Amino acid sequence: MKENSTPDLPRRLLLQAISAGLLWSLIPASSSALEGEATTKSVFRLKGRAWVNGNPVDMNTLIKPNDIVKTGHGSELVFVVGHHAMLLRGRSHLVIEPHESESVGSLLIGGLRLFAGKLLSVSRNKGMRINTPSATIGIRGTGVYLEAGPERTYFCTCYGEVDVQAVNDPDSKETVVSAHHDKPLYIYGKGQPGQFIHPIPRLPVPNHSDEELIMAEALVGRVPPFTEKS
């Protein structure tokens, strides 16, 4: 194989994430987290203000299924629940729903309900759902980013496979298979039957980054598929 002195895309992204301080200061020190086992630590970054069940968040706060997570204006919270890592931006309201088959105290997530705000989420859970005021999204082990408002949801399948359906129109549904931010969508709360979901081009100013996805996956001992060499 011919040698190339220019770093390939995966290596370049990793270097950018490290230089930006997104990785090493956040990755759990315990070997169990790096080996992909669940860690008991929840909060890895807190910028500004956040609350869990109405209580202020600090670096020792534990977040688990059944919790209600909110963030203040201009804030950002990076946290892990089991094998699921999330980045929640400011002015967000998120409910973490437990898995139906799990016992009390389990960290396995059954679903996420984003009432408002902006969420980046990485998970290998299959059969999980994310709900917003206008969309129901079936997750099959993916990285996703979404912004939930009262009238529409912005949704990007960063990688993986999802089933998307409009809450107010069962005929508006779509399966998206994405390798790398291939098909962002708007899902509306109102519209013509069968036309509540609209593909959109990539935004001129990205609202989430590969470095953030790399960071989130690293927190649970994984790497995104787009960083893996073919």
Model region roles, listed by residue range:
Residues M1-L9, A20:
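Secretory targeting signals
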Residues L14-S25, A29-P65, G72, V80-S230:
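Flexible, surface-exposed loop/linker segments and immediately adjacent secondary-structure boundaries
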